[in-house]
Amino acid sequence: MTAQIIDGKAIAQSIRTKLSEKVTARKEAGQRVPGLAVILVGADPASQVYVGSKRKACEEVGFISRSYDLETNCSEDELLSLIDSLNDDPTIDGILVQLPLPAHIEDSKVIERIRPDKDVDGFHPYNVGRLAQRIPVLRSCTPMGIMTLIKSTGVDTYGLDAVVVGASNIVGRPMTLELLLAGCTTTTCHRFTKNLEQKIRQADLVVVAVGKPGFIPGEWIKPGAIVIDVGINRLDNGTLVGDVQYEAAAQNASFITPVPGGVGPMTIASLLENTLYAAEQYHD
């Protein structure tokens, strides 16, 4: 068996095209264009790349894109004050603060300062709580994008045994909630998990988000399983690889996401979907 590739790049492009059409329709109806504010603190090279991609995608679909680049040594109060002003700005539907933040700024305080109806990253405790209670509104972007990828396979998720490797607030934990909502029996694995191999070998669906190149051997993948590789790791030779040993995994899986071109583009597409949702549901 050779896995079918889940082309996140193509699916994300399809989403952006639909969003662009909706923005055009809003303009023609005399409605406001959605607005996204992106805040970057410091000059971390990876963060600059991510922020650049988000701003470019925003402009591509016709959203208003507002950029705020703050110095690494900016105070927490300065950042919170900027968020307060954007919370009150009627032209802005979504506020995104690129993580990680410098050590002197508390992530949770910043995330909770963003108004829940403008939390298009889906990180605010209110929005995570809505997902936990099975009434999601603004959902965490990477898990939301992954669910779109899984749906694209046409596989019925109800009753699947799913394993999520990684328990971060950004991916692992909300991913577990999304899969529960989709009817899976879900196991979340983390650094203290015993018998990881055994759990993965039994899984119909595996989502891996640990940030370690080739962490999951391909031969662990159950024949016919769906593999979603969230990792994006740059090797010393410049090659980008995922957290799963791709070639071997692709021999067993029924569907697999490539790295790059799998989950990454979907995270940004989901961010744009959330921004339009916030405009339509909360701010029109």
Curated annotation (Swiss-Prot):
EC number assigned by the record: 1.5.1.5, 3.5.4.9
GO molecular function: methenyltetrahydrofolate cyclohydrolase activity; methylenetetrahydrofolate dehydrogenase (NADP+) activity
Gene3D superfamilies: Leucine Dehydrogenase, chain A, domain 1, NAD(P)-binding Rossmann-like Domain
Pfam families in alphabetical order: THF_DHG_CYH, THF_DHG_CYH_C
Binding site for NADP(+): 166-168, 232
Catalytic activity: (6R)-5,10-methylene-5,6,7,8-tetrahydrofolate + NADP(+) = (6R)-5,10-methenyltetrahydrofolate + NADPH; (6R)-5,10-methenyltetrahydrofolate + H2O = (6R)-10-formyltetrahydrofolate + H(+)
Keyword Transferase among UniProt keywords: no
Function: Catalyzes the oxidation of 5,10-methylenetetrahydrofolate to 5,10-methenyltetrahydrofolate and then the hydrolysis of 5,10-methenyltetrahydrofolate to 10-formyltetrahydrofolate.
Protein name per UniProt: Bifunctional protein FolD
Source organism of this protein record: Shewanella sp. (strain W3-18-1)
Source organism phylogeny: Bacteria, Pseudomonadati, Pseudomonadota, Gammaproteobacteria, Alteromonadales
Gene field: folD
